[in-house]
Amino acid sequence: MDLADLVDPAHTALCVVECQNGVVGPASSIPAVAAAVADADLLARLGTLAAVARSVGVRVVHCTFRSREDLWGGNRNSRLFAAARKSEVQQVEGTAAVEPVAELGFDADVDVVVSRSHGLSAASGTQLIPLLRNESVATVVVVGVSLNVAVPNTVFDLVNAGFQVVVPTDGSVATDADYGNRVLEHTLAHVSTLTDVTTLAGVWQR
């Protein structure tokens, strides 16, 4: 399928995974991820892509993580979750940590926030898939952090749910850049359509 047809604004949504202050901002619970984001200048690129998406009617969905202040109900079953629980920065609901970073130009009038409090995927056990289906979305563009865990998990769940998924290769990072490139080449390329932010924005602006 031609990329322009695949990402037609009439049936496409842009999902931005965990680009929130407490993850990719200066005060991060995962400093290595925040550093990778800064080194790649990722937020500026995603801010541009989100602005283009809004301008053509593509819904921007911010997929965030949040927890209760007492962390009740959160996962304890992996090293990743254990490290997050020990961090001085917590993604507590109602705090600045769970808000989308300013670079994304969050627009409360049109953007959507879908939060989760458990798991590794923005799509599993959240409202994301039902909301997309209710709006007749067929294609989901997935960007954000990170290629280590959350982005691949989200892509897999969306593909399993029957959506076409598009992944801009410069729209995500991993804590090891070479590893991120391997995930894109050897895994996500087989289950999604790879492109880049500039090409995607150009298609939307035609």
Describe the function of each predicted region.
Residues M1-A13, V52-V56, F81-R206:
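Active-site-adjacent betaalpha module
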Residues Q20-G25:
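Short acidic, Gly/Ser-rich segments with clustered Asp/Glu that frequently serve as metal-coordination loops
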Residues S28, W72-R76, G180:
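Short aromatic-enriched loop/helix-cap "lid" or pocket-rim segments at secondary-structure transitions
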Residues V58-F65, P168:
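Short beta-strand segments at enzyme active-site cores
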Residues C15-C19:
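N-terminal nucleotide-binding beta1-loop-alpha1 segment
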Residues D41-R59:
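A short, N-terminal amphipathic alpha-helix
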